[in-house]
């Protein structure tokens, strides 16, 4: 749970949080910095609000169980290697 004026998730803030499996980010977050969720091996789902305008390098690197990423905005800039090491299944 975040409060106040936090607008950026710092570099590696949740890195190696092995018990984190689901996360709904609050609407005050604008930037997810590098490797913020790297190696969160249990993370399966994350909801990213429309206020997020940048998801930086390797933010979700090696989140091997990540199945669902809900991004509310089409204007969010996503670096090419954000999901490095993740394996997604395409669902119609």
Task: State where each predicted segment sits.
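Consensus positions within tandem repeat domains that build extended binding/scaffold surfaces
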Residues: 10-13, 33-36, 56-59, 80-82
């Amino acid at each position: 749970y975040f409060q106040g004026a936090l607008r950026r998730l710092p570099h590696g803030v949740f890195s190696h949080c092995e018990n984190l499996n689901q996360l709904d980010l609050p609407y005050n977050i604008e930037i997810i910095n590098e490797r913020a969720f790297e190696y969160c091996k249990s993370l399966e789902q994350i909801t990213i609000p429309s206020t997020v305008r940048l998801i930086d390098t390797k933010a979700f690197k090696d989140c091997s169980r990540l199945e669902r990423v809900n991004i509310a905005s089409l204007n969010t800039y996503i670096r090419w290697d954000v999901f490095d090491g993740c394996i997604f299944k395409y669902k119609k």
